[in-house]
Amino acid sequence: MNKFLIIDGLNLVRRIYAAIPDETDMQSLTERVSSACTKLLRVHRPSHVAIVWDGDEISWRKQLYPDYKKGRKPMPEPLAQGLVALQDHLTAMHIGSIYAAAEADDVIATLAIKTAKAQGEAIIVSTDKGFSQLNHRHISQWDHFNQQYLDIAALEQKLGVERSQFLDLMALAGDSGNKIPGIAGIGPKSAAELLKTFRSLPTLFSSLSNLGAKQAKKLAEGKEMARLSYKLAQLQTDLPLNINLKDFRVIDSQPEKTINQD
């Protein structure tokens, strides 16, 4: 069975970069990222590995909702200037890069789902909790900085909802980190309580008469914003990748076919 290690490039690199005392020291960054990748390969022993990078195009989410990720700090200039050299160094280490047109998240999600559907195992290396929506027994998420897999049970307890309700929670309460709006006046706690009672968005919105007038009014007025927020939070898993697995092979394995759109 193929085991594909899928690294969220900027999630890893920017966290490492933030810990470097001298932000212009690209040599130190390269050494630390190389060491991290070497450790990832040693710990997980994958058959395939790829590091996925964000692109420069405006994402479809930003086009749909211009305030999406508004206020995010731009990439520090030294890192922006040194990124290509770092990527070349990783290529020399036989860690192939995949370049997304815009956001890496959708490419990572697509690659993970396609790997799992092909009876392989996908390990996503990222601290981004958004990947927890990929509810498949052959997909796991590894936090390199804490050296542990994402604890879904702990996340469910923290959020107050089941994994299958993650997107419904984002639709109602939004996500301040990504500037996903949710419904005005509905916070994470009240959203979790609503989902505990009604289980899903369709059931909730068809049961507004069972709620108090004030809360029902908020939900009714915010229904379209909830739909928008759901769409913004949902990862795309059906992008055309057109990659050949042999380009990302770490160890000897059987010849692989091209991963394409189903």
Curated annotation (Swiss-Prot):
Instruction: Note whether Oxidoreductase occurs among the keywords.
Output: no
Q: Which SMART domains match?
A: 53EXOc (SM00475), HhH2 (SM00279)
Pfam families recorded: 5_3_exonuc, 5_3_exonuc_N
Would the keyword Transferase be found if you checked this record's keyword annotation?
no
Q: Where does K(+) bind?
A: L172, A173, P181, I183, I186
* Catalytic activity, EC: 3.1.-.-
The organism's superkingdom is given as Bacteria
Name a biological process GO annotation.
DNA replication, Okazaki fragment processing
Q: Per its record, what are the GO molecular function terms?
A: 5'-3' exonuclease activity; 5'-flap endonuclease activity; DNA binding; magnesium ion binding; potassium ion binding
For the ligand (Mg(2+)), the binding residues are: D105
Which UniProt keyword terms apply here? DNA-binding, Endonuclease, Hydrolase, Magnesium, Metal-binding, Nuclease, Potassium
**Region of interest (Interaction with DNA), residue spans:** 185-190
Cofactor(s) this protein requires: Mg(2+); K(+)
Record text on cofactor binding = Binds 2 Mg(2+) per subunit. Only one magnesium ion has a direct interaction with the protein, the other interactions are indirect.
- Please list the residue ranges annotated as the 5'-3' exonuclease domain: 162-259
Fetch the InterPro entries from UniProt: 5-3_exonucl_a-hlix_arch_N, 5-3_exonuclease, 5-3_exonuclease_C_sf, DNA_polI_H3TH, FEN, HhH2, PIN-like_dom_sf, Xni
Query: Which family does the record claim for this protein?
Result: Belongs to the Xni family.
Give the function comment from the record: Has flap endonuclease activity. During DNA replication, flap endonucleases cleave the 5'-overhanging flap structure that is generated by displacement synthesis when DNA polymerase encounters the 5'-end of a downstream Okazaki fragment.
- Listed HAMAP family: Xni
Protein name from the UniProt record? Flap endonuclease Xni
Q: What is the lineage of its organism?
A: Bacteria, Pseudomonadati, Pseudomonadota, Gammaproteobacteria, Alteromonadales
